[in-house]
Every structure is written in structure tokens, then in C-alpha cells.
């Protein structure tokens, strides 16, 4: 039965198959045929991508084409007959537009894209895209000079992002160590062209930026084709570079069409060698500058010292310092003059005050009781020392003391006498004698 059934299947035409089931499965050839039919209905399509693999075998080209933005890749084949019609300079890393027709190989069960035409993406289109991105980033301020960080004068450790064993790495290290032998590098290798450029360079920048010992970062590549450098104008890479806290030096080395990383970086170097010279000071040049500075300082100090010596010599020739006795002599003359003037003023003051004292003495003498006594008046006192102002105060027989200008007399009161026509004005004074 099994053999009969196989014979019938092979010899008899099969009707259109229904849906495959467990009881009625499709043969592999039928499934493969249907897949090829579905794929062939797609026809030829123009696609844009980046060549990530390019190999030639037997005159044919076998390669892979990667999407420019998404993580998608397809293989392609260019037969030798077609290869003769496409640009001869196509290579890995180029951005291209290709006319591809999907082809499913039944025997091998593989899908390939047969290329009937392939050409570079127009430079005009690429430049237009870059200019739009440049304008956008400029409007956001990523190119402003004031946001650029200053490079350290002598970095202790320099971060380097470059291709492994590349000429750019050798140029940077050799020139930096020639200028300053003690300089240290921390190198992180990354793809510098192709589809891995953006993610690997971005990761390397962030790794070095997180290292506290790294004081400046150099991204170096030894020039190359414009299309090979497009990764250094990728928006995600540019924004990552703008967000670094460590100063960044771009040394891509392409003068004709500078990648946008040159605009975002804190410093743009024309070549990797130029980057080493801009980042690392030359020890020989610095020693020359030190010697020159010391010479300038010595010359300046000598000039200052000579100027001060001349000024001191000039001061010493002045009379005040040439002979100091004139100061004492002039002050001695002033002192003599002031002493004479003071003596004169004191003498005048004494004479004036002496005259005033004499005047006051005369006034005092004229007003004193002694002056009254000298004019012939007397003071009469009883035995108790009280002044007798009226006859009734000294009855007859009272012992009296009479004071005159020349002294005192003892007396005894007699009887009272009548008051004369011109009596004394002061009851305590007796009438003048000898009148």
C-alpha cells in the first residue's frame, strides 16, 4: 500500500492543495514553492542602506546591507555580469541605493537579494541631511563657543578613542610622548567606520567620561572617505559628545568635509598629530619659556634695584642728608628766639600783674581799719574785748582798752560827757586827737 501510494503521487497530477493539516501535510517542496511564489510577487525594489560586508568570489560579490537606523540586515548577491555595470569603487561602509529582487533558492532553502543595480547615495542628498542636522544642533546651542570647555594645561591622564592598531593611535601616542614623556593614556578601542562606529564610539566616550582620572578625551581617526566618516555626524553620537563633562578633542582628520563632531567638540584638531600637540605641552618649549621668564624677571629686578640705588644716591646728596647739623642749628636758633620771646612775655606779664597788685594793695589799705586809725581814730573795748559804741556801754570806772594806730592804751572810764557838735560817724571810734 505504501509503495502503491507513492507511485500514484509521483505519476498522477496533484490537485490544488488545501490547507496543510496533521492528516494532510504539505510536502517541503510545496511549501518552498509557495514561499518562492510569495517572494517573487514582491518584485524588484529600490532600497537604501549601508554596506557592512563586501566579498568577491568567482567574480561575484557577496555582501550584506544594513538599515541606516534600525537593527536590520539582509544579504545580497551581485553576479559578475551585473558587477561590471556598477561603480567599481563600492566598498564596505558605503551608503548605497540598490535595486534588489528577492530570490528564494528552493534547493538550499535560503533567501538572497539579487542586485541588478547599485549606486552611491547622492552626495547632494547626504549633504542636505547633514545641513539640516547642523542647523538643528546650532539652533539648540550645541555649537556655541561659550559652552566649550577649556583643556587642562598638563593633563595627567588622556583618554583616547580610536581604532585598534591604527595609524591614528600611533601618531597620537608617539607625538605626545615626544613632547612630554611622562604623559599617560587610557585607550578604548572602537570601530571608526561602518555600522558599529556610532554605538562603539558612544560607549567609549561615556566610559572615559566616567573615569575621574581622565582629564581630556581625544577621538582620533586618520582621515578617510567622506562616507566612511558619516558615523561621526550621527545625531545620537553628537548628543552624547555634547553631554560629556570631560573636554573633548575631535581629530578625525578630514579637511574637505568636516564631520559634525568637529563642531560639537571643545577643540577641533586637523590630524591626530595635531591633537597630540594641542593637548600635550612640549617639555622643551616649556623649559625655554621658563628660562625666558626667569631672564625677564632678572632683568626687571636688576632695573628696579638700579633705579632704587640711583634714587637713594640722589637723596643722599640733598642737604638734609649730606649734613645733618643744619637741622640742629636751625632748630637751635628757633629755640633761642622762642626763649627770648618767652622771657620777654613773662617779664611783661609779671610787671603788669605787679602794678595791679600795688593798685589793689592801695585800695585795700584805703579801706582797712588801720588806715582809719592812722587818721587819728581809736577803737575802745571793755575788759571783755567788746567794742564800746556808746557812753552807756562803759559806766564810770569801767576798765577800757583803747587801740590807736601805734598800739593800745589802758584807761578807766569817767562820767559821760555830752556829744560834740561833730561826733564820730562810727560809734566804735573815738574822736580824732590833736584837732
Curated annotation (Swiss-Prot):
Give the EC number: 3.1.11.6
Main location (coarse class): cytoplasm
Q: Which InterPro entries match?
A: Exonuc_VII_L, Exonuc_VII_lsu_C, OB-fold_nuc-bd_dom
Q: Which GO terms describe its cellular component?
A: cytoplasm; exodeoxyribonuclease VII complex
Using the UniProt annotation, give all residue ranges assigned to the region (Disordered). Answer: 1-21, 413-435
Q: Does the keyword Cytoplasm apply?
A: yes
Biological process (GO) annotations held by this record are: DNA catabolic process
Quote the biased-composition stretches of kind Polar residues, using this chain's numbering. Answer: 1-10
Extract the Pfam families matched here: Exonuc_VII_L, tRNA_anti_2
Report the superkingdom from the record.
Bacteria
**Protein name according to UniProt:** Exodeoxyribonuclease 7 large subunit
Q: Which organism is it from?
A: Leifsonia xyli subsp. xyli (strain CTCB07)
